[in-house]
Amino acid sequence: AEKYPSISPYAYCNGNPVRYIDPDGMACGDPVRNPEIRRNRASNLYGEGIRYLDGQMRNHQGFDYYAPIETDVLAVQNGVVVQSGESNTAYGISVTIEHTIDDTNIVYSFYAHLSEVNVNVNNVVSEGQIIAKSGMSGNAETTNIEDQHLHFELRSQPGNIRGLSGKINPNEIVDTKFISQFPELKSFQSQIGIIKINKDGTAEIRDYNAR
């Protein structure tokens, strides 16, 4: 993979603007070890109008990480579990964790399509703790091996709300950042690869998988 030195692990581009994230604040761990995006497709990132379904452009509320069934799912930051188990939605089995940032800002990490959970509501969890195993629950039950994934969201409020309302780009909290190679080409994100920005500041081009 092509490397790009001197890119801050706490900076990322999303439609051009570069944002700095305090390394002692929100940026913490990743929800899976050695994270990669499903099929390296930009349409599996967070964004408005980046998916073409049923003849319409659709939003995507989070990141889809490639995760074969039974992959360990990790808490991205210290927090308290506020939801765990079957969600009775397209998300299937899921976990929601509340995090307090800088003593005042509260956000929620959300992990979906799980096969099993290891935590209960009100459990205190630590960054990197195994909280669940990935799976194919909810509307992921018919996915093939290449498409098995963990759906991860960062939210400003708990609960499942349609669209991007209450959703935050996951790059705000994860260690490893992912951005589209060409974010301006909205209607073609399913045919565009990604750029992976590692914790050490190096970046790698990942061409999309057309299989």
Placement of each model-derived feature along the sequence:
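Short turn/helix-capping motifs enriched in Asx and small/polar residues
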Residues: 1-30, 186, 192-201
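Acidic glycine-/aspartate-rich tracts in secreted/extracellular proteins
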Residues: 1-3, 17-18, 86-87, 157-160
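Surface-exposed, glycine-biased beta-strand/turn segments
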Residues: 28-93, 102, 127, 136, ...
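Active-site region of chymotrypsin-like
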Residues: 63, 93-120, 147
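Structural detector for hydrophobic anchor residues on beta-strands
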Residues: 71-73, 77, 107-110, 168
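Active-site-proximal beta-strand/loop segments in catalytic clefts of secreted hydrolases
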Residues: 77, 84-85, 98-100, 110-115, ...
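Short, solvent-exposed loop/turn segments that connect beta-strands within catalytic domains
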Residues: 89, 101-107, 159-165
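Conserved, short, structured surface segments that act as functional micro-motifs
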Residues: 95-97, 123-197
